[in-house]
Structures are given as structure tokens and as C-alpha cells.
From Swiss-Prot:
Keyword Transmembrane: yes
Annotated TM spans: 5-25
Source organism of the structure: Pinus koraiensis
A single Gene Ontology CC term: photosystem II
Membrane topology (UniProt): Single-pass membrane protein
InterPro entries: PSII_Ycf12_core-subunit (IPR010284)
Family: Belongs to the Psb30/Ycf12 family.
Lineage, opening ranks: Eukaryota, Viridiplantae, Streptophyta, Embryophyta, Tracheophyta
Name of the protein this chain belongs to: Photosystem II reaction center protein Psb30
Signal peptide: none
Subcellular locations according to the entry: Plastid, Chloroplast thylakoid membrane
Length: 33
């Protein structure tokens, strides 16, 4: 595999994973407050 393909896949996975994580973290912060 090319480095460009690996980089694109890693960026896509980070975006997909970071989305729900941000929502969960914000929900936890609101719950704690």
C-alpha cells in the first residue's frame, strides 16, 4: 500500500472515531455539571 493511501485511511478513521467521542465527552461534561 502507498503511504498516501494509508494517510488517507488514518485521517478518515480518526474523523469517524473522533465524531462520537466528542459527542460522548460533551454529554459527560454536561452530565457532570
Amino acid at each position: 500500500m502507498d503511504l498516501e493511501v494509508i494517510a488517507q485511511l488514518t485521517v478518515l478513521t480518526l474523523m469517524v472515531v473522533s465524531g462520537p467521542l466528542v459527542i460522548v465527552l460533551s454529554a459527560i461534561r454536561k452530565g457532570n455539571l
